[in-house]
Amino acid sequence: MKPRLSVALAALLLGVAATVAAQDVNIPRPADEIERELATAPFVITAAEISRPKAEGDITLKAEVSFAGAPPYRVKLRRAEPGAEDFNNRPRYDLAAYELQKLFLDPAEYVVPPTALRMMPLAELRTYSPAAKPTFKGSDDVLVVLQYWLNDVKVIADVYDPVRFAADPKYARHIGQLNILTCLIEHGDSNVGNFLISRADAGPRVFSIDNGVAFEYNESDRGQLWIRMRVDRLPEDTVERLRRISPEELQRRLGVLAQWQLQGGRWFAMPPGENLAPARGVRSADGIVQLGLRKADIDRLGRQLARLLKQVDDGKIATF
C-alpha cells in the first residue's frame, strides 16, 4: 500500500473510532448488556443518597450498586409506593418509555437510558430509604426502577436549542428522535433535570431520564414543553421505522411489560404471560403481579403515532 494511501486510511479509521467513542461516552457499554444486568443479575447497594436533596419530597436515590459481585457502578434507583400507581411514580411508565423507543431507534441512539424493574427486600432498601413500604400484599418486597446513570452529561435549562438544531445535523437528529418519543408518550413534565444533554461539543446526544408523568396521567405544574412536537423536521429513516409500527405490535410489546410470581413470601420475576386484565395497568391474580400499559393507553399511543405521521405527510414536519 502506498504511504499516502496508508496515511489517508489511518486517518479515516481514527475518525470512525473517534465518532464511535464520542457516541458511546454517555453509555460506554452495550445497552442490551446493561439492561440484562439491571433486570436479572443479583444486586447489592453499596452506597446511596438522595439524588436531588434540595428538591422537596424527592425519593430517587443516586446509588452505587454491585451486580453479581462485580465492582459497583452508579444507577438511579426509585422505589414505588404501595400499589405501584402514584402521581409522578408509575414504574410501568418508565419501562414503557424505554421499551417503546426500541421500535424506532437503534441502541446507539436510545434517548432513554437502560431501565429495568426489580423487586428487592424492604430491609435492604430501608437502610437508604427509611420511608419505603412493601409494594404489594403478601411480601415485604419493594418494587424499584433501576436506570443506568449516564456519564458525561449536564443539566441545562432546555436541551432544545433552535439555533443549534439548524446548524448541527447530528444534534438535530438526536433532538428529533427525543421529540418523537416525548410526543408519542405525551410527556408532561419538563422540569429541569428530567432532560439531559451530552457534554460533547458536536452532535451531542440528548436523553429523557424521568418518564413517570406521561401517557394518560401527564398533568404537571412544571411545564409541558415536550408533550407535542417542538421541531419542524425529523430524520427520514426514523420516520420510516415509525410507519412500520402496527397497533398489534404496540399491544404485544407494551401490554405486558413485567411480571412476578409470589413464592415463599418473595416476588420472583417471570417471563411476561397473557395479559391478565387489559383495562388495568397494575394487575394481580392467583399470586401473580403484572405491569403494563392499559389498552386505553396503547390505543391513545396509536392515535398519537397516526397524528405525528399525518403531520409529516401533510408537510407540516419535514424530513432530512
Predicted regions and their residues:
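Bacterial N-terminal signal peptides that target proteins for export
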Residues: M1-L9
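Cleavable N-terminal signal peptides
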Residues: L9-A10, V20
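Phosphate/dinucleotide-binding and metal-coordinating scaffold of catalytic cores
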Residues: A22-F320
